């Protein structure tokens, strides 16, 4: 198992050296970088704003945060506008069904045939 650990350490050292040497458009470790820029092949540290030899830039985490609130706001806006209209329309037919009942009782009193 010790040989496997040594091979893993050599692989990590080689990966760090490859980022330090840099290729086209790659800045060396310790160089100043901007968040979201592709000049740093590793990771641009947010606190120190320095290049670090890590695979997987943090640019992938930003669009997931931006897309989640847009999905949340689009859904409830349609349901909120339709819910109050349904609530106001539902009690109206119940009131209309109750109102004609006293009018039917009043009609025979308004028609005096004895005179």
UniProtKB/Swiss-Prot annotation:
Q: Where is this region: Disordered?
A: 54-115
User: Where does this protein reside within or beyond the cell?
Assistant: Secreted
- Say where the protein is mainly found: secreted
Q: Does the keyword Cell membrane apply?
A: no
Q: In which tissues is it expressed?
A: Expressed by the venom gland.
Question: Membrane-crossing residues?
Answer: none
Q: Which UniProt keywords apply?
A: Disulfide bond, Knottin, Secreted, Signal
Signal peptide positions are: 1-22
Gene Ontology CC, one term: extracellular region
Specify residue ranges for compositional bias: Basic residues: 68-77, 86-115
Disulphide-bonded residues = 26-41, 33-44, 40-51
- Tell me the domain comment: The presence of a 'disulfide through disulfide knot' structurally defines this protein as a knottin.
Tell me what this protein is called.
Cysteine-rich venom protein 5
Q: Which organism does this record belong to?
A: Pimpla hypochondriaca
